[in-house]
Amino acid sequence: MKNIELKKFFNEDDSFEQNGKMIYLVPLKEFMKTEEFASFSPVSRKDKNETTGETSITKCQFLNSSAWTDVHPHMIIDKTKSEKTIKYVDLGEKAVGGEFPNIEYEIMVRVNEDGTLNRDFVREVKKGRFKNKEGKFVDTWYYKKGYEHFCPVEYPRYYRDPSF
């Protein structure tokens, strides 16, 4: 699907003006059908099965960041070849149903008037490392400012604990 076709999802209630241009929120599931989304490079996530010892590799296009009791979704838009540094944009959310505390959310993407991804707030995060017992460096997930943990996922989720 071409990005311009996202215009059918534009809604004045889900839009705002920023630096003289309109920004629209469209559902992530629709943005994932575009050619632009298909051009983003995924990040590899290695998972080791502790019982069998086998390692599986999953290609991930999203990050879930967790800090305290909140999980926030992000979309990966670029990476270095070694995947030590990745660039991402934050995804928004919109309440679409349910009642407190069981509110249902839909994940939204910020796009420009022509349907292309809004890149005004591209952020960067680096892979964390630690030394194991043998003195070798082991890469872990991604960290920012030492407290926010970023985990690559196939599809993002949103969660906020209202009791915190």
Report residues per predicted region.
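Mixed-charge, low-complexity intrinsically disordered regions
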Residues: 2-73, 89-164
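Short, conserved beta-turn/loop elements at beta-strand boundaries and strand-helix junctions
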Residues: 79-86
